[in-house]
Design a protein with these regions (language model features):
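Outer-membrane beta-barrel proteins
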Residues: 29, 68-77, 109, 113-118, ...
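Cleavable N-terminal export/targeting peptides
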Residues: 1-36
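Repeated loop/turn-to-beta-strand initiation elements of outer-membrane beta-barrel proteins
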Residues: 39, 77-83, 118-121, 158-164
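Membrane-proximal helix-loop-helix units in multi-pass membrane proteins
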Residues: 120-136
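Predominantly the C-terminal beta-signal and adjacent terminal strand-loop region
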Residues: 91, 144-194
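Residues that define the transmembrane beta-barrel architecture of outer-membrane proteins
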Residues: 37, 59-67, 89, 102-108, ...
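Outer-membrane beta-barrel translocator domains and adjoining extracellular loop/strand segments
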Residues: 49-59, 92-101, 131-144, 172-180
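Short glycine/proline- and aromatic-enriched beta-strand/turn motifs that initiate or cap beta-hairpins
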Residues: 31-91, 95, 127-129, 184-194
Length: 194
């Protein structure tokens, strides 16, 4: 058994994380926000797609639509934390396996947000799930992998919110399909109840 590590990817990922952390530290000095606590529900779409982990080939053939449910609580006036559940569906085709025409991705995770007025910048991580769907009663086994993402957005005092996220999962391995990842962007429009 051998273990391969691509140090270029690890170094690039760590440098992005370090840069993002430094920007957050700089921005948190003048933050005056008071994030809302409560449940949030959002709907949206984007380009969140399964791709071949080796070649980068995309398997999706349509836009992706979905929803998000979260609970947010303030961590002082400058930060908030969320527990989030997001689910998205789209059409797609796998090579050498034509019975599946759609896929479903799910994220169950936690997010930390830094606030400046009504605007926020957030980072999150969690467990990503992927299933290929033939019909409502027939789908592939559900595979899972860790992953992370980042986003930005705003929430109004009346509760309306808009956010944009970039997502990237680790590799899903399955005996049915080639190794895959879920990557892409998603936009969310929603409402948070006090």
């Amino acid at each position: 058994m051998s273990i391969c590590v691509n140090f270029n990817e690890v170094t690039m990922h760590n440098s992005k994380l370090l840069l993002f952390t430094l920007v957050l530290i700089y921005w948190t000095q003048p933050l005056l926000a008071d994030p809302r606590a409560g449940w949030g529900l959002g709907f949206g779409g984007g380009s969140l797609e399964p791709i071949n982990a080796s070649s980068g080939t995309s398997y999706h053939t349509s836009s992706v639509y979905g929803g998000t449910l979260d609970y947010q609580w303030p961590l002082g006036k400058s930060f908030s934390a969320l527990i989030t559940y997001a689910e998205h569906v789209g059409k797609g085709e796998l090579p050498n396996n034509t019975k599946y025409k759609s896929y479903k991705t799910t994220l169950l995770g936690a997010e930390l947000r830094a606030w400046m007025g009504s605007f926020f910048v957030g980072v999150h991580g969690g467990q990503y799930y992927l299933a290929w769907v033939e019909s409502l009663s027939s789908y592939s086994g559900i595979v899972s992998a860790g992953g992370n993402g980042y986003g930005l957005g705003f929430e109004t005092k009346s509760g309306w919110m808009f956010s944009a996220y970039h997502e990237q999962s680790s590799t899903f391995t399955s005996s049915e399909f080639p190794d895959q990842k879920v990557e892409g962007n998603r936009l969310v429009l929603g409402y948070r109840w006090p």
